[in-house]
């Protein structure tokens, strides 16, 4: 691992770049917060998406093996965003050059989706994806994610996929 990497910093930078890229393609974008400090609870973040066409939560993953280097799109158990989830996982794989291909994954909890942000979005009728940009326990992936230029490439590629999915390209 690279000790200078913080998932929260990467996610914050990437979301700002992705927001700009989506807006440049004609989409309206809202975020769950306006500053990096402070945060809503997990389910409340998802619920903030009421009225939106998509809730997207940006992350990097972690595991106990430094060799795992793959994107993962955690989709809601409803299956409504499986196609877009796979497309986003594929583009993360292509842009980052991860060792393993991207996949989608679902996890059922006691009250619907296991992940609070997905559960919250589903409760207000918003299709949702939690997108893992590989694993920050992998040094190559972490070093890639530390580059602002790489995050810009990722934001542009993800914005193209989302815009195409919604028929805007």
Each language-model region and where it sits:
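Active-site-proximal helix/loop segments of hydrolytic enzymes
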Residues: 5-169
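Short, surface-exposed beta-strand segments enriched in small/polar/acidic residues
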Residues: 1-2
């Amino acid at each position: 691992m690279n000790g200078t990497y913080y998932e929260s910093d990467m996610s914050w930078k990437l979301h700002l770049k992705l927001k700009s890229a989506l807006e440049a393609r004609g989409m309206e974008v809202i975020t769950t917060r306006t500053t990096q400090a402070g945060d809503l609870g997990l389910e409340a973040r998802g619920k903030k998406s009421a009225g939106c066409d998509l809730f997207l939560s940006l992350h990097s993953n972690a595991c106990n093996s430094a060799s795992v280097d793959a994107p993962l799109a955690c989709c809601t158990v409803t299956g409504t965003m499986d196609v877009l989830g796979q497309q986003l996982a594929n583009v993360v794989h292509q842009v980052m050059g991860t060792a393993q291909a991207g996949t989608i994954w679902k996890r059922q909890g006691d009250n619907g989706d296991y992940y609070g942000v997905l559960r919250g979005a589903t409760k207000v009728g918003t299709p949702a994806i939690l997108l893992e940009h590989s694993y920050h326990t992998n040094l190559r992936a972490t070093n890639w994610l530390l580059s602002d230029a790489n995050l810009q490439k990722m934001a542009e590629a993800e914005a193209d996929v989302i815009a195409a999915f919604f028929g805007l390209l």
